Amino acid sequence: MPEFEVTPWEVTGVVDYNKLIEEFGTTPLTDDLLKKTEELTKKELPMYFKRKFFFSHRDYDLVLKDYEAGKGFFLYTGRGPSGPMHIGHIIPFFATKWLQENFGVNLYVQITDDEKFLFKPQLTFEGTKRWAYENILDIIAVGFDPDKTFIFQDSEFTKIYEMAIPIAKKVTYSMAKAVFGFNEQSKIGMIFFPAIQAAPTFFEEKRSLIPAAIDQDPYWRIQRDFAESLGYYKTAALHSKFVPGLMGLGGKMSASKPETAIYLTDDPEEAGKKIWKYALTGGRATAKEQRELGGEPDKCVVFKWLEIFFEPDEKKLLERYIACKNGEILCGQCKRYLIEKVQNFLKEHQEKREKAKKEIEKFKYTGDLAREQWDKAIPEPLRK
């Protein structure tokens, strides 16, 4: 058995991200590229980049060169609406918001209600459409520019099918099978879907940049195989690490294991109880032992969550790390600190989520970018 495994559907074990870069054939996100990002945006990098939560890429160096040369680029990401969103789902959207805000670029968010219906036997099509609405509220609450962001559901934006047809003509079954592991039991809709997922990378005649967790990388490998034959750029990607569930550093937070996840719609008080009960710490067997030997923050989910998202202050994070190692603070103190941070985040997010109900039409239909996409003809290279 491998010590860890990463696929688009499952992540198991404690991931060695350096080995994963070798396995996937991606490139480390270097300090030089991060420095270049700071120079071009003239803004301090957010913690997701400074702390290497985003750690790997494909062609991000070319994205920065395009931007510097005045060619620009655009952002593309998405969400498969199979249930409620949790903290692990939303963090890449905050990084995407920073990129949109500081590079001033367009963003396309694909809501794959069709994919989830096809790939999840227990879901109905009406069910995935309902979850699409709920998930879109969470995405809008992040704070994207409504005139530079187009959020679309595949079941509504049927123009995407017309764009997917010439893409599907380029992709053989063996290519799709090699990436996704299709077999004789795979439904024909599943086999066609990669063409639909690739279509948004051709919305503009610029390079697209996809910020996403690295387990999603296989979806874009096919696009990179044929994009240039259609007269477009290979898509670029920024890969994030995984947000661990509450009960351990292995794998990733999973919506199918409610005790490991904090959902964006959780009652803040209940979320606090969940963290207190389930969050794994790097503590010793007794308080006395911890004061003598110190804690182990590198094995601690509580510290990892602070590092990834909930403690933006570098000085405070380092002080907490050292205090833990020196036995100066106990696990209960850190749990209470994290609970307060998470509860404040949930309260603020849920207020913004409620306001998003009045903004959803602009993101989907009436904003500048949305209107442009609904009115636009199919790009010429895809009509040949």
Curated annotation (Swiss-Prot):
Record-level GO cellular component terms: cytoplasm
Keyword tRNA processing belongs to the record: no
Protein name per UniProt: Tryptophan--tRNA ligase
Record Gene3D superfamilies: HUPs (3.40.50.620), Tyrosyl-Transfer RNA Synthetase (1.10.240.10)
Primary localisation category: cytoplasm
Keyword Iron on entry: no
Domain of life, per lineage: Archaea
Motif ('HIGH' region): 81-89
Record's subcellular location: Cytoplasm
Single Gene Ontology BP annotation: tryptophanyl-tRNA aminoacylation
Pfam families cross-referenced by the UniProt entry: tRNA-synt_1b
GO MF annotations, alphabetized: ATP binding; tryptophan-tRNA ligase activity
Motif ('KMSKS' region): 252-256
Keyword terms, alphabetized: Aminoacyl-tRNA synthetase, ATP-binding, Cytoplasm, Ligase, Nucleotide-binding, Protein biosynthesis
Top-rank EC class of the record's enzyme: ligase
Entry similarity comment: Belongs to the class-I aminoacyl-tRNA synthetase family.
EC number of this enzyme: 6.1.1.2
Reactions mediated catalytically: tRNA(Trp) + L-tryptophan + ATP = L-tryptophyl-tRNA(Trp) + AMP + diphosphate + H(+)
Organism: Thermococcus sibiricus (strain DSM 12597 / MM 739)
